[in-house]
Regions:
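Non-heme di-metal
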Residues: 1-244
Length: 244
């Protein structure tokens, strides 16, 4: 008889020991999936190898999608056009760019607000630092998505107000930060799921390009799904109620 493993739903009650065990299991999974942390280059061992392998098997659109060279220029161009006939491929790429730009700002703020590896005092500190290196790797994968479409990206600094807001948020106490961070991870996954289907529609005529974009997005989504579980493990009963 087939045994079906039943898992708790994400908002199910979890004791402190349950959450501690979840952190330990997640840490073991991280080391198996991505290898050693490379803090000096804000990367991870196996993700570095994966990114290098992408450079040996490049995929590009058959023709440039636009005359501009960078995502920043494309974003500015579309903002001035307001055309209902705008290329939907460019609109999809710009949505990804704007999302990833805010991700970049938040990651940089969190990187400066968290202790470096040698000063991490416990497992959750190490997981947090590892998590941030994953996010830096995701920025490289986003850049690779744009490169597939013959566009370059240079993550711009946000305004002083936005940088200050992100920096302040990264320094919130855990009881305040954790429910918000959990909700942010869930919303991010919803964005990625929508993006997955949007890419299917707009790049249907270039199957090789679509496969590469999906490959890159899937690499990000697997990590983000793990981040949802990680963030849930930070939440006690009160945090779960706030997150809901």
């Amino acid at each position: 008889m087939i045994q079906i493993t039943r898992y708790k739903e994400i908002f199910a009650p979890a004791s402190p020991s349950d959450r501690t065990r979840a952190f330990e299991d997640y840490w073991a999974y991280l080391l198996t999936r991505d290898g050693a942390l490379q803090e000096e280059v804000q990367s991870l061992e196996y993700k570095t190898h994966y990114y290098q392998s992408l450079q040996t098997r490049p995929v590009r659109t058959q023709q440039p999608l636009t005359q501009v060279q960078t995502m920043a220029e494309l974003s500015d161009l579309l903002a001035t056009q307001h055309s209902p006939r705008a290329d939907r491929r460019l609109l999809a790429l710009t949505a990804i760019y704007k999302f990833a730009s805010h991700e970049a700002a938040g990651i940089r703020a969190a990187w400066t607000a968290t202790p470096p590896w040698e000063r991490c005092q416990n497992l959750t500190d190490r997981i947090t630092r590892y998590h941030l290196c994953e996010e830096f790797c995701h920025l490289r994968l986003f850049a690779e998505m744009f490169k597939v479409c013959r566009l370059q990206v240079d993550w711009p600094p946000l305004s002083w107000l936005a940088r200050t807001a992100y920096g302040t948020f990264a320094r919130f106490p855990g009881w305040c930060l954790d429910p918000i961070a959990f909700g942010s991870e869930v919303m991010g996954m919803m964005f990625y799921r929508h993006t997955w289907h949007a890419l299917e529609e707009v790049f249907a005529q270039e199957p090789e390009v679509l496969r590469r974009l999906h490959e890159l997005l899937a690499e990000i989504m697997v990590d983000e799904l793990g981040h949802i579980g990680e963030r849930r493990s930070f939440l006690g009963n009160t945090g779960v109620k706030v997150a809901r």
